[in-house]
């Protein structure tokens, strides 16, 4: 089984959902979660991903668990805007390989901005899929 890449953000409603979907598309073993999961995936994110042929409409945000972190060989945090719920400090204490992709949260942004975030995530996931 391939090493697991875990994508983590606060709500698991946008960035980490897109990253997991692109990772799956590019042959990575991936999962995603949030420290304070939203009720649903951001509808603008669903629309932006549909343009790439990826359907997130049935995805549900997931709560980050210690078990998820323990199973991952790499944890990618997606930038934090709310310090109290940022996953990075907690994850740093768990001695995992940790990378932060400082990306803006698509929440409340128009589709044009969400597309830019989506494309940046896809580019970073493609780079990740090429690394050993």
Regions found by a protein language model. Name each.
Residues 1-9, 26-27, 53, 73-74, ...:
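Solvent-exposed, well-ordered amphipathic alpha-helical segments
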Residues 1-66:
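Conserved active-site segments centered on acidic
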Residues 13, 80-83:
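Short glycine-rich anion-binding loops that position phosphate/pyrophosphate groups of nucleotides
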Residues 38-41, 82-86:
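Short, charged/polar "capping" segments at the starts of alpha-helices
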Residues 57-67, 83-92:
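Short, basic, helix/turn surface patches
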Residues 69-71:
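Alpha-helix C-terminal capping/helix-to-coil transition sites in glycosyltransferase folds
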Residues 84-132:
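Phosphate-binding/catalytic loops
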């Amino acid at each position: 089984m391939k090493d697991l890449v875990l994508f983590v953000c606060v709500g698991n409603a946008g960035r980490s959902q897109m990253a997991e979907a692109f990772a799956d598309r590019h042959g990575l073993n991936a999962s995603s979660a949030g420290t304070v999961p939203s009720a649903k995936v951001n509808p603008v994110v669903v629309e932006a991903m549909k343009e790439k042929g990826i359907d997130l409409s049935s995805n549900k945000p997931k709560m980050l668990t210690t078990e998820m972190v323990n199973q991952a060989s790499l944890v990618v945090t997606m930038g934090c805007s709310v310090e109290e719920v940022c996953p990075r400090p907690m994850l740093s204490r768990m001695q995992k390989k940790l990378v932060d992709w400082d990306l803006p949260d698509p929440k409340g942004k128009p589709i044009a901005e969400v597309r830019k975030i989506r494309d940046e995530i896809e580019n970073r996931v493609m780079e990740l899929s090429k690394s050993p």
